[in-house]
Amino acid sequence: MRVANFTIAGGYRSTLQLLGDPRVSPTAIFVASDEMAMGAIMAARDLGKRVPDDLSIIGIDGHELGDFFGLTTVSQFPETQGRLAAEAVLHALDGESMPAHNVDLPFELVVRRSTSVPKDQLPA
């Protein structure tokens, strides 16, 4: 795991560190934001890695530039998250007591060009 402050530059730096470590040889990186994943794609390419042939990269957010980068992403529907959070706050402000509970939120896996099966697992 690397810390990358949710920016393209942070994702780039962290991926350079990760891929520069001779003790690890990942076939995939799951990144905590699309911005960082874009930086990871750029770093991998600068190091001569082919995305996705040598390294699959997936982000989270559904960023509008994801299609340009060919980035596989998990889209989270922030409008729905915000609406549900606002409703919970309004109920609390009205004095309504709500027990703690889990809320299942929708998401969508958007598969693009940054992911594939690892080479050693492809049929011969």
Show where each model-derived region lies.
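Short beta-strand elements in bilobed, periplasmic/extracellular small-molecule ligand-binding domains
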Residues: 1-9, 69
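Short, well-ordered alpha-helical scaffold segments within catalytic/effector domains
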Residues: 8, 12-16
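Flexible loop/turn connectors
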Residues: 14, 20-124
